[in-house]
Amino acid sequence: MFYDYADSGSWTESTYRSNESDFQKIKLRQRVAVNMTNRTLETTMVGEKVTMPVALAPTGLTGMQHADGEILAAKAAEKFGVPFCLSTMSICSIEDVAERTTKPFWFQLYVMKDRGFIERLIERAKAACLLYTSDAADE
């Protein structure tokens, strides 16, 4: 079950197959003998300086692959100077990730019917950035 979760797509896997096909079409153009001295990938994202315009996206149940999966991902993002976003469906708690990192992280919010739970979750998150997920059915 864990392998299928990590290495497949949902339902008919049509999006998974489409993404795989699209990635195969990407061709990187190699450039050699170019002076790279003054080039940088540094930029800002939601007002914060980052080393490159990349963020570690929220991945639900990362802890199924490794008990401290979200913590390790957050620490790696911090080490390399890019944002980390914790999923509502993470195995590690907001508090556990915050305790083991020094920078604020983003939090992906799935809005559910229990508004009290959502309000408490937002209060716990106190993230630098709150990402609202609108692709999930309201159960």
PLM region spans:
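Conserved small/polar residues in nucleotide/adenosyl-binding loops
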Residues: 132-139
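Conserved, mostly hydrophobic/aromatic
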Residues: 56, 77, 135
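Hydrophobic faces of well-ordered beta-strands that scaffold small-molecule active sites
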Residues: 54-57, 84-86, 105-109
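Internal gly/pro-rich beta-alpha loop/helix module
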Residues: 116-131
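Active-site-adjacent beta->alpha loops and helix N-cap segments on the catalytic face
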Residues: 87-101, 115-120
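An N-cap/entry alpha-helix motif that binds or orients negatively charged groups
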Residues: 1-48
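Glycine-rich anion/phosphate-binding loops
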Residues: 65-72, 114-120
